[in-house]
């Protein structure tokens, strides 16, 4: 198997072919010997394949862009990708392969939250920098050595949206999430902050992402006193729930999260999703930022590299890419060097997703200032609430 010029190799998660693939990747030539290697564990198939495929496309495009301009510090970048099929057990096998090969200086952790949790601890113990492309709060609270989340965690999504719901008078919510990592983490985080924001949780529904009919669950919600349905899922069940929410004419407000901010979701639910409340980070609403905002410049660059609208998943990947690049430029292209730079030299680094702030005690990059909340109008997001979009007060 030959490696694509841009340095990204997608490998099927099949044990029979892995030795052959990695033998070809490891072949030594002058250009390969000087390359900087990363591993990427991604859900390219399975329930969260939209996440994994979007992550891979963003990594693919950005790495190609960097390599066409000299790579990082004059060295070509190579990202080897393994499919975990949205399965934490397969993710563990993938990450162990990256850990065992000393040429890999860092790992892009899975966009599947459960898989990221299962593998982040292993990478931490092995001493290899691991940046999850998903938002499992427990991975970084408390912080684990070498394990990071540069995108928003489920906790940050919850805090951002709870503040907005309070501001518009929503007090009673029904939580709904899939039985995966993100679908459980989100409702759990809302439960923890509910009292602070004056929220009453009427009930919580956890569902299988393989389900195709939610009419019974939605009818229960419709007949409740809940003012809003807050949905947590990045699976194909999301569009189904949105469509049935509209068909059953629920009177409640529909509340979505960044997991639903992608061209595929917005186009697939166009007409049904209009009016929904949603939140994300700055990469997905960069055109609304002031022209002087440095994040706008980085997000515009990402948009030009991708040649399509920026999704939440693109922002997840971009934050990790920008952080790894900054860490190598400020430190060294070694496992220890990258980790030291992440913990000590990345405060206020501008990425397409927002500014990231890391320290030895904080391994979550984005902060509340990089979040926005708004509505979906004409099948597009429109930010309404967030520090970056606040109009300066008149003196």
Label the model's feature ranges.
Residues 93, 137-139, 145-249, 287-297:
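Extracellular/periplasmic Venus flytrap/periplasmic-binding protein
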Residues 28-40, 71-76, 165-171:
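Immediate post-signal peptide segment of exported/extracytoplasmic ligand-binding proteins
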Residues 1-37, 68, 389-395:
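Short, low-complexity disordered leader/linker segments with a strong preference
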Residues 242-318, 375, 380-393:
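Extracellular/periplasmic periplasmic-binding protein-like sensory domains
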Residues 36-59, 82-89, 111-114, 178-184, ...:
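Extracytoplasmic "Venus flytrap"
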Residues 98-111, 131-133, 172-177, 225-235, ...:
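Periplasmic-binding protein-like
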Residues 35-37, 50-57, 69-139, 150, ...:
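Beta-alpha junction/loop-to-helix N-cap segments that form part of ligand/metal-binding clefts
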Residues 304-314, 325-381:
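Segments of small-molecule ligand-sensing domains
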